[in-house]
C-alpha cells in the first residue's frame, strides 16, 4: 500500500473509531430503550454485540469507568476445550459452542488467538481412571481430538513437564486469547452498530412498569422493555429483586503470577492438573503476548470487592505450579494479581442463562469457562431477546473491526509508511513492549481514560518494568488528548488518582 493510501486508511479508521467511541461515552439522549444490558464484562459485551444485529435501541450500563474492569481483566486467558463440564449442563454446552465460535470471531474482530492445545496431567497410575473420566466427559460434550498421551510422546510435546507426570489428556482444541482484546473488540463493534455505553453508572434497583422496567441508577432512571443481567459477582442481587427463586453468589478469589517473556517458552501448551471440587486447579500456560502465566488459587469469600494478593496465596500457587513444571523461575515474576469468579452457592449448580422472569434475561454465575462461553452466551441471549421483541435484523450490520496497529509487529516497509503518515508512530513511549505514541493516542480515541485503560488496550506499562518508565509519558499523552489535568487522571477510575498536586503547591 502506498504512503498516501495508508495515511488515508489510518485517518479514516481513526475518525470512524473516534466517532463511535464518543457515541459510546456520550450517547444519544434516549431514556427509553428496547434492551438495557447491565455489566460491561466480556459476557455483557458479547450480548451487546450480538443484539446490535437487530433494529433495537440498546444501552449497556457499567459501574466502572470502562469495560473490562472486573473478572474479564483478571482470569486465565484461555479457551477451554470443554472436557471438564458435566455432560448435559449449560456449562458444557456453552463452553463447547463458544470454543467452536472463537477462532472465526477473533478473525472478524482482529484479535490474537493461538490454538496451542491443552494437557491435563496425571501424576499417579491410581488417578488414571479420573483422567479417563475427563476423556469420556469430553467425548459426551462433543469435544474433538481428545486422547491420552504418555511417556516419550508427552515429553516430546512438553519438554519441561514434571518427570512425575505419568500421563496427560491432550485436547488440541484448547487455545489462548487476550481477554482484554476480546472484550474491547466486542464493545467497539457493538458501538459501531449503535449500542450506547454508559460508564460510571451503578444500578441501584430495578422496578417493573407497564411498559417494562425502570432501572434506577446513580445517574437517574432509565426505562426499557427488557433487561439483561450480566453483572458478574453482583448478578445475584439483581436476580433476587425480580425472581422468586433466589440465588447466592459467593466469589472465589484466584491469584495469579505473570512471568517475564524470557520464560514464555517454558510451556508450549496450557498445562492443567486433574480438577478438584474447587475448580480446574493451578495451570501453567503461555500467553498470546509471549509471557508465562501461573494460577489461579481458589479462595471463597463473601467480599465482592477484595482482590488483593496474599503471601500465603502466592506461596501455595508457586508450590502447586511446581508440580506441573518444576523449578519455575519465580524470581522472574513481573506482576501478580487476583480476580473473582462468580460462583453460585445457593439456588443453582450451573450457569443461569435465559429468561428468568418476564422480560428479564440474564447470564448469572458465569465463572470458568465463562470467557470461552461468552460468544455462545451472547448469541443465545440475543436471539431470545430479539424474539421477545419481534426485532428485525439489520441489513447494514458491521461484522468486522480493525485492531490498533501493533507497530512492532508490522513488516518494515509498512512500519515506515505508517510513520511517514503519522510521526507519532515513530515515537516509542513504552520501551519494554515497544509501544508508540501513535498506538497510545489511538487507544485514547477508542475510549481509554485511565492508565489501565491504555495498558489493557495497547500494553503500554504491561512489560517488565510495569510502567515504571513510561507511566509519566503516558499520563502526559492522556492529559493532552483529553484536555484533562494530570492531577485529575487515575490509574483505573474512581478515586485512584496518581498525583496529589504540583510539587511546589503541596505542603
Go through each PLM region and give its residues.
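N-terminal Rossmann-like FAD-binding beta1-loop-alpha1 element of flavoenzymes
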Residues: 35-59
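Short hydrophobic core segments
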Residues: 36-38, 222-234, 378
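Active-site substrate-recognition segment that forms the wall
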Residues: 46-50, 79, 111-114, 231-359, ...
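Glycine-rich FAD pyrophosphate-binding loop
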Residues: 53-72
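Dinucleotide-binding Rossmann-like beta1-alpha1 core, especially the glycine-rich loop
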Residues: 77-157, 281-282
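Short beta-strand to alpha-helix junction loop
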Residues: 93-96, 124-130, 170-188, 307-312, ...
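Helical element adjacent to the flavin cofactor pocket in flavoenzyme catalytic cores
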Residues: 173-225
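C-terminal catalytic lobe of FAD-dependent flavoproteins
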Residues: 288, 305-428, 435-443, 452-453, ...
Amino acid at each position: 500500500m502506498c504512503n498516501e493510501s495508508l495515511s488515508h486508511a489510518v485517518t479514516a479508521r481513526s475518525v470512524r473509531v473516534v466517532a463511535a467511541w464518543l457515541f459510546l461515552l456520550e450517547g444519544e439522549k434516549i431514556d427509553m430503550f428496547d434492551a438495557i444490558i447491565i455489566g460491561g464484562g466480556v459476557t455483557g459485551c458479547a450480548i451487546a454485540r450480538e443484539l446490535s444485529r437487530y433494529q433495537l435501541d440498546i444501552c449497556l450500563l457499567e459501574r466502572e469507568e470502562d469495560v473490562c474492569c472486573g473478572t474479564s481483566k483478571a482470569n486465565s486467558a484461555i479457551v477451554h476445550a470443554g472436557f471438564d463440564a458435566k455432560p448435559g449442563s449449560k456449562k458444557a454446552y456453552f463452553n463447547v459452542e463458544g470454543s467452536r465460535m472463537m477462532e472465526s470471531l477473533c478473525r472478524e474482530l482482529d484479535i490474537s488467538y493461538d490454538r496451542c492445545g491443552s494437557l491435563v496431567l496425571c501424576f499417579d497410575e491410581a488417578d488414571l481412571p479420573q483422567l479417563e473420566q475427563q476423556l469420556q466427559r469430553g467425548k459426551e460434550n462433543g469435544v474433538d481430538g481428545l486422547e491420552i498421551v504418555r511417556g516419550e510422546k508427552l515429553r516430546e510435546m512438553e519438554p519441561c513437564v514434571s518427570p512425575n507426570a505419568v500421563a496427560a489428556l491432550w485436547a488440541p482444541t484448547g487455545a489462548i486469547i487476550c481477554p482484554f482484546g476480546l472484550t474491547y473488540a466486542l464493545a467497539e463493534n457493538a458501538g459501531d452498530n449503535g449500542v450506547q455505553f454508559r460508564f460510571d453508572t451503578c444500578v441501584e434497583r430495578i422496578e417493573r412498569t407497564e411498559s417494562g422496567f425502570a432501572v434506577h441508577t446513580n445517574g437517574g432512571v432509565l426505562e426499557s422493555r427488557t433487561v439483561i443481567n450480566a453483572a458478574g459477582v453482583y448478578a445475584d442481587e439483581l436476580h433476587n429483586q425480580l425472581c422468586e427463586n433466589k440465588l447466592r453468589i459467593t466469589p472465589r478469589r484466584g491469584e495469579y503470577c505473570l512471568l517475564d517473556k524470557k520464560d514464555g517458552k517454558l510451556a508450549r501448551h496450557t498445562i492443567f492438573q486433574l480438577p478438584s471440587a474447587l475448580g480446574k486447579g493451578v495451570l501453567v500456560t503461555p500467553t498470546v503476548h509471549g509471557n508465562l502465566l501461573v494460577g489461579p488459587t481458589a479462595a471463597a469469600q463473601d467480599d465482592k470487592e477484595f482482590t488483593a494478593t496474599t503471601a500465603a496465596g502466592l506461596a501455595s500457587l508457586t508450590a502447586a505450579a511446581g508440580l506441573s513444571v518444576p523449578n519455575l523461575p519465580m524470581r522472574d515474576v513481573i506482576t501478580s494479581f487476583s480476580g473473582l469468579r462468580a460462583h453460585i452457592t445457593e439456588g443453582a449448580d450451573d450457569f443461569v442463562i435465559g429468561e428468568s422472569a418476564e422480560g428479564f434475561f440474564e447470564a448469572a454465575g458465569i465463572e470458568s469457562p465463562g470467557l470461552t462461553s461468552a460468544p455462545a452466551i451472547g448469541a443465545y441471549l440475543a436471539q431470545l431477546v430479539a424474539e421477545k421483541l419481534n426485532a428485525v435484523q439489520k441489513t447494514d450490520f458491521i461484522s468486522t473491526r480493525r485492531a490498533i496497529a501493533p507497530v512492532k509487529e508490522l513488516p518494515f516497509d509498512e512500519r515506515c509508511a505508517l510513520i511517514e503518515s503519522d510521526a507519532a508512530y515513530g515515537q516509542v513511549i513504552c520501551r519494554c513492549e515497544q509501544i508508540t505514541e501513535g498506538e497510545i493516542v489511538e487507544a485514547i480515541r477508542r475510549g481509554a481514560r485511565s492508565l489501565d485503560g491504555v495498558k489493557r488496550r495497547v500494553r503500554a506499562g504491561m512489560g517488565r518494568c510495569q510502567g515504571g518508565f513510561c507511566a509519566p509519558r503516558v499520563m502526559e499523552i492522556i492529559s493532552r488528548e483529553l484536555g484533562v489535568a494530570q492531577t485529575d487522571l487515575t490509574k483505573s477510575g474512581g478515586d485512584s488518582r496518581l498525583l496529589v498536586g504540583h510539587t511546589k503547591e503541596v505542603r
